[in-house]
Amino acid sequence: MSQLLQQLGTDNEFIRRHNGPASSQHQHMLNTVGAETLEKLIEETVPSSIRLPQPMQLPHGLSENAMLAELKQIAQQNTLNTSYIGQGYYNTHTPNVILRNVFENPGWYTAYTPYQPEISQGRLEALLNYQQMVMDLTGLDIANASLLDEATAAAEAMTLCKRGGKNKSSTFFVADDVHPQTLAVIKTRAKFIGFDVVVDTDSNLDSHDVFGALLQYPGTTGEVKDLTTLIEQAHAKKTLVVVATDLLASVLLKPVGEMGADIAIGSAQRFGVPMGYGGPHAAFMATREKLKRSMPGRVIGVSIDSKGNQALRMAMQTREQHIRREKATSNICTAQALLANMASFYAVYHGPEGLKTIARRVHHFTAIVAKSLQSAGFELAHQHFFDTLTVKTEQQTDILYTKALAASINLRKFDTELGISFDETTTVSDLVALLAVFGVDNAECDSLSNDIGQDEFAAIPEACRRTSSFLTHPVFNTHHSETQMLRYLKKLENKDFSLTHGMIPLGSCTMKLNAVAEMLPVTWPEFGGIHPFAPLNQAAGYTTLATSLKSMLCEITGYDDFSLQPNSGASGEYAGLIAIQRYHESRNEGHRNVCLIPSSAHGTNPATASMVSMKVVVVKCDDNGNIDMIDLAEKIAKHQENLSSIMITYPSTHGVYEEQVREVCDMVHDAGGQVYLDGANMNAQVGLTSPGFIGSDVSHLNLHKTFCIPHGGGGPGMGPIGVKSHLAPFLPGHSENGVQGSDYAVSAADLGSASILPISWAYIAMMGEMGLTEATKVAILNANYVMDRLRPHYPVLYRGTNGRIAHECIIDIRPLKEATGISEEDIAKRLMDFGFHAPTMSFPVAGTLMIEPTESEDLAELDRFCEAMIAIREEMNKVQQGEWPLDNNPLVNAPHTQVDLMSNEWDHPYTREVACFPSVQAKASKYWPTVNRVDNVYGDRNLICSCPSIDSYEE
């Protein structure tokens, strides 16, 4: 191709959109860090021993338009049949006001988990609404702010039963009418935690001695029955009872809490979130007051701020993996906040009466079809149901199933029965087409429907009918016009800080650009409208997408195979450690159960190791932040016979490329162990090195970090795992789609949160080999630039051999606190006044701040951040010198709100301008925190996890 034609082409044009600093600015930045060229900086930063010998074999980057055209062709390979499969997944209408203003809105999807509550009050309110919605519909005392999927929630509930119960048995009961994908995930969890699982009809529960039981209501085949007596019998034997339930069904059905259930779990998918071939969706868990401190997942609570005003926050964080490590209630980090928010907004928009209308409509459609089929001579497996029928079709099963497929209808197929599940998208014409498959005339259906319409509970037994009110809080009874809803959504969005406002420099979080072109395909119906258990030939587009993405990831990581099933980084860790343990078992070395973990590791690492019954042995780090090789050698020697693995992060969580990483891998391999390399910091590897090249056996990748899936304010995430060939046979399987051994599932669907995979595919396709490698280099340049600008003012805790850092740096606040009395929390809160989200606080070292600017931030934003940090350091000096008292200065009083600015009283030794407009940029474009500093201790001592009364909002 001629030079002119190359210039006229659009290959690689996206790179300059993704990377923040213009190439013309690189030299200024390099001068600041003291490097001649970008390549020279990389040579001084990344050890030569781990540099890739040749570039990745990936195509040139596509333009945005070319990528979207290619991805559209892939999407159109999917076939969108009308789905009646059910089994926990249903078509739904996403209200357009929510689609446009939340799902497609970077103000919602680019925010981070609300660890900084003062700049997160909007999504905290939305998540509190979600908890209230779940509590009301399940009839239980407290709910969390989402889990990964229904099957994972069931597995978490099983372990909660063991933690919170008094029965000494090690056996867990699962009713035989629980969704099969849920049972599969429970079996995986039980095996590696040491529990037995017994599957039987729920009527036989009383004959088993078990610590917990899982029932389904309605059952997977649709049956609705009163569980009260079964639960009472279980309680008599000190057995805790979990009930998997359906939120829409709970609008008409007696809540499981009123039947005595201890725990309720399920999925909020049908509240406005597309099926997406399996996800992402928000699962829920609700429980009794007595179990609240053992419940897994994030919980939003009501507290007060420093002025005594109501403020929301994440409550009871001492249960979580980032604090409790191997003693945590769960390894869950990222959950499904964005999808939980969408579900809560669905309930807010429709309100209780709107939900009743939808539920009645679904139930009446089901009842009409039931009567029509019975009048045509078909027998139903159950007479009581909400939205699902199981039809006894005997020898006609295959014929009718095939006939339905020919009519573009998907039914659920059993050996001699067919399942039919209805949802809010079902129409009268759908019913006519469905009944035609069974040979039922439309006129018959029409005459039968008159009787059914008179009865709200057409096929629900009296003992199972809901009589209690729900969603009585004003928030669910106000915003029912689109104008009202639009303004409510905007009001909440305006309270929160996201990437639309400025840099989010959270270390170990990689808050990079989530480009619009990457996000667009997520809303395409070809990706959103497919049921995860549809026949595989209807998901040809997803198969093509998954195969292509796995190939890309193998090339990037140096691994031989990938599973896309894990739907979070923590889930990926879990799947990876299971693969290691199954590998050892296959070699008759199942006794290997010791997992070495450096003291710098992320809290999910020890929490996950504990979930697979590993013994966690901590390896020390030296004064430079590297693994202490002497201590490592001693620990390996001590545990050689039982050594399973080591979990390392690279670059290390201390923000440096450890020179001896290959030696670490060799030492563990020589002792018979496997190397798990946590992919959290993959953003500093792509194109320069790779886990496989370094010597690792397995890694998870955080697609919501390195590969541009947005954080969504706390999820969704994706944690696919890559493995070397010897571990490939031990990747997760899935029973529904018959993949890879069909067992050891870690998620409810084979491709996990499949509908967000296009985001990462699009990013890689548009960046290509050159762009991905340049992004890594620019991430390193940006981090070193920030470090060198801040180093004269703040101690940098760890640097590599040549004084360089990887993609993030840790500044040490401890000596400054000793000198000034100002803490890392004070700095974090003061940054809000300057218009920034705080860096990561006190991780991986207490009393520090970890900063990761990513490659997407431009030079002006980097300088704005550095100038804010330098200004804060000058404010600390004023405190140290006595110009401002320690208990009354802009740092300890931060953040400052509009109420502070307009207050009639001002008893501070600094001006309102210093408080609220500390920089030129803050004056030009001010982000306002909506509450003062939140009181964490008060919130946990006075735990309230439901929507506050309307009176509490009044002045």
UniProtKB/Swiss-Prot annotation:
Assigned EC number: 1.4.4.2
Reactions that this protein is recorded to catalyse: N(6)-[(R)-lipoyl]-L-lysyl-[glycine-cleavage complex H protein] + glycine + H(+) = N(6)-[(R)-S(8)-aminomethyldihydrolipoyl]-L-lysyl-[glycine-cleavage complex H protein] + CO2
GO terms classed as biological process: glycine decarboxylation via glycine cleavage system
Annotated positions of the N6-(pyridoxal phosphate)lysine modification: K705
N-terminal signal peptide: none
GO CC terms in record: cytosol; glycine cleavage complex
InterPro entries the UniProt entry points to: GcvP, GDC-P_C, GDC-P_N, GDC_P, PyrdxlP-dep_Trfase, PyrdxlP-dep_Trfase_major, PyrdxlP-dep_Trfase_small
Record GO terms (molecular function): glycine binding; glycine dehydrogenase (decarboxylating) activity; pyridoxal phosphate binding
Keywords: Oxidoreductase, Pyridoxal phosphate
Cofactor: pyridoxal 5'-phosphate
A Pfam match: GDC-P
UniProt enzyme class: oxidoreductase
Subunit text: The glycine cleavage system is composed of four proteins: P, T, L and H.
Similarity field: Belongs to the GcvP family.
Function field: The glycine cleavage system catalyzes the degradation of glycine. The P protein binds the alpha-amino group of glycine through its pyridoxal phosphate cofactor; CO(2) is released and the remaining methylamine moiety is then transferred to the lipoamide cofactor of the H protein.
Name under which the protein is recorded: Glycine dehydrogenase (decarboxylating)
Organism: Aliivibrio salmonicida (strain LFI1238)
Organism classification: Bacteria, Pseudomonadati, Pseudomonadota, Gammaproteobacteria, Vibrionales
Gene responsible for this protein: gcvP
